[in-house]
Amino acid sequence: MVNMNIIEIRSDKIYKKIMDAPINKKEDIYRYELMKPFEFKWKCMNVPIVARQKGGYDVIIASEMLGVLSPKDIDEKQKKNINVLSADKIWGTCKETIENSINAFIKEGYDLNIKDYKYSILLANPNSSYTILSDGYWGDGGIPGYIFLSLVPNEYTINRLPVLIAHECNHNIRFQFIEWNNNITLEEMMINEGLAENFATWMFGEEMLGPWVSRTDIETLNTYIKPI
């Protein structure tokens, strides 16, 4: 297979530093050690690592809006979750799944421009509507070369990581051929998500279909989706 470089940003180690840091240091550790490696991704989304003015829109506010746990909430109460993310097996599985997912396209003759793929696993805010809608796990792979996996760590969400990675890798491949546009239409979004979920279930089976496909109903629409 074509050489590729899978770069893991070990969030567990960074989260431990945040957990042990005083409250006035937590945001900078999160900003510069966990999010800075993904600066290009955030730039594509018009999100600055550092706000242009005090209290302004930045990577911390943006990630909180997307359902990621705020650095100010990373304290001793998150110790168990951080310990779950510390298992080397989880990171090894992630790397292997990224390689297998991308190689599936290379074997079909796709000539990919991106050779470096950077990823990390983030702690999701369990009270976020995004997290609730997604059964505690979700991802972001819309910018080629960068993948975020977000979850509330437990047996169910950890077991779902491979299928989530396959879904996000499909986005990573697709957007190497389609220019990213922040003004994406609902039609385009449905196509993107449908292709990604189809690929993920092709790799891991229909029983691994994500909740964003399998359990969307009128009550969910009115209670969670419309308020967002």
Regions found by a protein language model. Name each.
Residues 1-90:
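N-terminal low-structure segments adjacent to metalloprotease catalytic domains
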Residues 6, 10, 14, 186-223:
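Post-HExxH zinc-binding segment in Zn-dependent metallohydrolases
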Residues 82-143:
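Auxiliary, metal-adjacent structural segments of Zn-dependent hydrolase domains
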Residues 141-146, 173, 195:
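Hydrophobic, aromatic-lined core segments that form the binding pocket/scaffold
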Residues 149-164:
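Short pre-active-site segment immediately N-terminal to the catalytic Zn-binding motif
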Residues 163-176:
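Active-site recognition of the HExxH zinc-binding catalytic motif
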Residues 179-181:
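Membrane-interface helix caps and helix-loop-helix hairpins in membrane proteins
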Residues 224-228:
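Conserved alpha-helical "signature site"
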